[in-house]
C-alpha cells in the first residue's frame, strides 16, 4: 500500500522514469514509481548516450557516475557496401563529452535505481496501472497490486505502448516505417574492428550498423530488414546475422550472441495537451527510428527538464503554470527536431534502388569532404543544444 498522498507518481521504471523520479525527489517532491515488470532489465537494450544528454546530466552528478560504466566511441565511418564514403570525428564537438558513451541499459537502470532509493523514492514492481482519474487537484491511480495512489501529478514513462497515454485518450500521431529492424549483441573476432568507431554501411540489402560495446570483443549490430522479418526472429541467430552482415560488407567471426531483438519502428508524437496533470515523457511521448540511438537521449532530456519545471508548477498551482507550459513547448520542439533528423537519415540509409543510393552516396561524400559538413553531422549525433 501507498499510505499517503504523493506529489508525483511516475509510471515506468526504465531509465527515463527512474531519472525523472530521482531528480524530482532530489528537488524536494514526494515520488513513487509504479512498474508493471517484476524486475529490472538484464539486457543491454538502449546503449547510446550522446554529448548533449551527458551535459544535461552533469549538474546532478549522473554523467560522472555513468562514465566508468561505458565505452567512448569518438568517430563515425560511413560506407556504401565495401566502399568507404568517409567519416567524421566527434572529438571536435564543443562539449566536455565529445563522444558517444555506450552503456548497457541494465547498468544505467541499476545506477538510477540505486540513486533513486537513496533519494527516498520507492519503486513498486509487478504493479500494472489499470485506471487514472483526474480532477482539478490531482490524479488517482489504480493498479492491480496497490490500493489507490493519490498524486498531484502523474508522469507517464511507460514506453511506446504507453498504458497511461491510452487511458488519457491522447492521440499518438505518425507513421510506421516499412520493414523491420534487428539488434544483436555479438562477441566477434575481427582484428580490423576499431573499438572507438561506429560503422554505418548502406547497400541494396539494407542498412548495417556496427557499434563497439562496453566489453572488448563485443559489438552491437543493427540490421534493417526491408522485408520485415519480425515473426521469424529476423535473420536468426549468430550464423544468420554473420551471413547477413557479410553480405552487406562486414565480415567477422561471430562467436556468441548474448541478446537479439527484432521489431518494427515508428515515427510518432503525442498530441499536445496543456490541461492535463498526466505528463508524457520518453517513448510514451515520442518514438523515432533507431538510427543514431536518439530515443533514449530524447527521453532523458525530457526527464531532466521536467525535474527543473515541475517543482515550481507544484508550488504555484496546476497544469496551466507558465513554466510548465514552456517545458511542454521546449520538449515538443526538441522531439520534432529529433524525429525530423532521424526520419531523414532513415529514408537515406534504407534506399534500395541503385540510382537513389548513388545520389545518396554522392551527397554523403560531399558532406564529409568539408569541415562544415563533418561538424554538422557530428552535431546531429550529439543532439540539440538547450534552448
Question: Model-found features: residue ranges?
Answer:
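Beta1/beta-strand and adjacent pyrophosphate-binding region of the FAD-binding site
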Residues: 2-16
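Core beta-strand elements of the Rossmann-like FAD/NAD(P) dinucleotide-binding domain
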Residues: 6, 144-153
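Glycine-rich FAD pyrophosphate-binding loop
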Residues: 25-46
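Active-site-adjacent segment of FAD-dependent monooxygenases/related oxidoreductases
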Residues: 45, 49-115
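Conserved FAD-binding catalytic core of PHBH/FMO-like flavoproteins
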Residues: 114, 153, 157-265
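A conserved short coil-to-beta-strand element within the FAD-binding core of flavoproteins
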Residues: 125-139
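FAD/FMN-dependent oxidoreductases across multiple families
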Residues: 233-298, 315-321
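C-terminal helical "tail/cap" subdomain of flavin- and related membrane-associated enzymes
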Residues: 309-387
Amino acid at each position: 500500500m501507498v499510505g499517503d498522498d504523493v506529489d508525483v507518481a511516475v509510471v515506468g521504471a526504465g531509465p527515463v522514469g527512474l531519472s525523472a523520479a530521482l531528480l524530482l525527489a532530489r528537488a524536494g517532491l514526494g515520488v513513487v514509481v509504479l512498474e508493471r515488470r517484476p524486475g529490472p532489465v538484464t539486457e543491454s537494450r538502449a546503449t547510446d548516450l550522446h554529448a548533449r544528454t551527458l551535459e544535461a546530466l552533469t549538474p546532478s552528478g549522473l554523467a560522472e557516475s555513468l562514465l566508468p560504466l561505458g565505452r567512448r566511441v569518438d568517430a563515425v565511418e560511413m560506407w556504401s557496401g565495401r566502399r568507404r564514403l568517409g567519416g567524421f570525428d566527434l572529438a571536435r564537438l564543443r562539449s566536455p563529452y565529445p563522444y558517444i558513451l555506450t552503456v548497457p541499459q541494465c547498468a544505467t537502470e541499476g545506477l538510477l535505481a540505486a540513486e533513486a532509493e537513496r533519494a527516498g523514492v520507492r519503486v513498486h514492481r509487478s504493479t500494472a496501472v489499470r485506471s487514472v482519474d483526474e480532477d482539478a487537484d490531482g490524479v488517482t491511480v489504480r493498479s492491480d497490486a496497490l490500493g489507490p495512489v493519490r498524486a498531484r501529478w502523474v508522469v507517464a514513462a511507460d514506453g511506446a505502448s504507453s498504458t497511461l497515454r491510452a487511458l488519457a485518450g491522447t492521440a499518438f500521431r505518425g507513421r510506421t516505417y516499412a520493414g523491420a529492424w534487428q539488434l544483436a549483441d555479438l562477441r566477434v573476432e575481427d582484428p580490423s574492428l576499431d573499438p572507438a568507431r561506429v560503422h554505418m554501411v548502406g547497400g541494396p540489402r539494407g542498412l548495417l550498423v556496427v557499434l563497439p560495446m562496453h566489453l572488448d570483443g563485443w559489438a552491437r549490430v543493427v540490421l534493417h530488414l526491408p522485408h520485415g522479418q519480425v515473426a521469424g526472429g529476423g535473420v536468426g541467430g549468430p550464423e544468420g546475422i554473420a551471413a547477413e552482415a557479410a553480405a552487406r560488407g562486414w565480415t567477422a567471426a561471430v562467436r556468441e550472441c548474448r541478446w537479439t531483438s527484432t521489431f518494427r519502428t515508428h515515427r510518432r508524437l503525442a498530441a499536445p495537451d496543456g490541461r492535463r496533470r498526466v505528463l508524457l515523457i520518453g517513448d510514451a511521448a515520442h518514438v523515432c527510428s533507431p538510427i543514431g540511438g536518439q530515443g533514449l537521449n530524447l527521453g532523458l532530456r525530457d526527464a531532466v527538464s521536467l525535474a527543473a519545471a515541475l517543482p515550481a508548477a507544484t508550488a504555484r498551482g496546476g497544469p496551466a503554470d507558465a513554466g510548465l507550459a514552456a517545458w511542454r513547448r521546449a520538449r515538443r520542439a526538441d522531439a520534432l527536431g529529433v524525429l525530423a533528423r532521424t526520419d531523414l537519415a532513415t529514408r537515406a540509409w534504407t534506399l534500395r534502388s541503385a540510382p537513389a543510393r548513388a545520389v545518396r552516396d554522392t551527397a554523403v561524400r560531399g558532406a564529409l569532404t568539408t569541415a562544415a559538413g563533418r561538424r554538422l553531422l557530428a552535431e546531429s549525433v550529439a543532439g540539440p543544444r538547450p534552448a
